[in-house]
Each structure stands twice: as C-alpha cells, then as structure tokens.
C-alpha cells in the first residue's frame, strides 16, 4: 500500500495545525487510486511529529511512503532537518520504502498557482 505523509512546520497556533490536517483529509478525497493512506505530520511544535507519522503510515499497512514537505522554500528544514529525521527513522521500518519528494515550492505548477492566486484578489 502506498502512503503520502504531508509534512508542515508545525505551529503553536492550533488552528494552523488543523489546516494542515484538513488539507490531508481533502487530499484523501481527491487522490483516490494514487495513495491508499494519507496523513499529516509536523517537523515540530505540533502532533503528529514526523517519526510518529511514518509509524502511523506503516501501522496502517503502508509499504511505500512518500514524504511531501509542505514548505515553499528550500531552507534548513527542507535541506537538513527533514532528511535527517526521515533517515534516522527509516531503519525502524525496513519493510517500507520511504522517500522524500521535492518540497512544494519546487513544483513547476507553483507559477500558475501564484498567478491564479494573485488574480483572485478580493
């Protein structure tokens, strides 16, 4: 089974964390046939942390996990912190193929999204 773990920074503001969880729930509904399991996880400041999110995916039956950093820029968290946490967690789940996708801001679709968002001003 294939899983997607959407990783955000995490916030002291619970509403911000809830938005990420809600986004993961929307992804579940819109990605039928692409991912069997979709969860949200956080780098820090909120539950579920990355190692716990990976465990949740494996416990749900995932044999392949894509970690998607929900970050716009390739700062330290994207370049160092997330890979370090994922690489430290991988040995705990040798039955799962765990890979990190490029961060959201690296997507070629970002230009269209920015223009569309700017054009939708109120």
Regions found by a protein language model. Name each.
Residues 1-122:
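Active-site-proximal alpha-helix that buttresses catalytic centers in soluble enzyme cores
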């Amino acid at each position: 089974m294939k899983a997607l773990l959407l990783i955000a920074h995490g916030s002291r503001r619970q509403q911000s964390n809830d938005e990420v969880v809600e986004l993961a729930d929307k992804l579940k509904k819109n990605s039928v046939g692409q991912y069997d399991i979709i969860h949200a996880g956080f780098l820090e400041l909120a539950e579920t942390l990355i190692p716990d999110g990976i465990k949740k995916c494996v416990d749900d039956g995932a044999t392949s996990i894509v970690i998607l950093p929900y970050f716009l820029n390739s700062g330290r968290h994207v370049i160092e912190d997330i890979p370090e946490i994922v690489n430290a967690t991988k040995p705990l789940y040798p039955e799962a193929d765990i890979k990190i996708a490029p961060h959201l801001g690296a997507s070629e679709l970002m230009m269209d999204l920015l223009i569309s968002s700017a054009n939708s001003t109120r």
